[in-house]
Amino acid sequence: MIKSKYLVQQFSNKIKKIIFILFFLTLCSTVFADSKMDLGLEVYSNKAQCGVCHTLQAAGSFGDIGPNLDQMNFQMSQIIYAVTNGIGVMPAYEGILTSEEIEAVSFYVSEKSN
């Protein structure tokens, strides 16, 4: 009986640790996503000035040269490719933006566009 109680207590402690770790990881991922969104908006609005050509209501941009991003449904990988290599009249940002900035602006656009 004592051994059984001990095993239950050990199991309970392990479950508590797992719950704590999951909570911590969830909190970290939320903070990471928020900072990535902030960097993405900064790159979109200021460094790359995407809003000069593109409409994206969430960013307060209403450019009419490139596609209206509010009406697009791109995969993040497609956005990364376009930002990195350019497409049509859109310039390539490889060498202008860091890979972190390219990923952040792509994440931002993929999350904020419809």
Give the location of each predicted region.
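C-type cytochrome heme c attachment motif
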Residues: S45-T55, G88-P91, E103-F107
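Gly/Gly-Pro-rich "capping" loops immediately C-terminal to redox-active cysteine motifs
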Residues: L41-E42, G51-I87
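Extended, non-globular alpha-helical segments
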Residues: M1-N13, V83-V89, Y93-I96, A104
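Extracytoplasmic copper-binding redox domains, predominantly the cupredoxin/blue-copper superfamily
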Residues: I2, F32, F62-G63, P67, ...
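C-terminal capping alpha-helices of c-type cytochrome domains
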Residues: G95-N114
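Electrostatic cytochrome c docking/interface patches
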Residues: T26-S45, Q78
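N-terminal export/targeting leaders of redox proteins
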Residues: M1-D34, N114
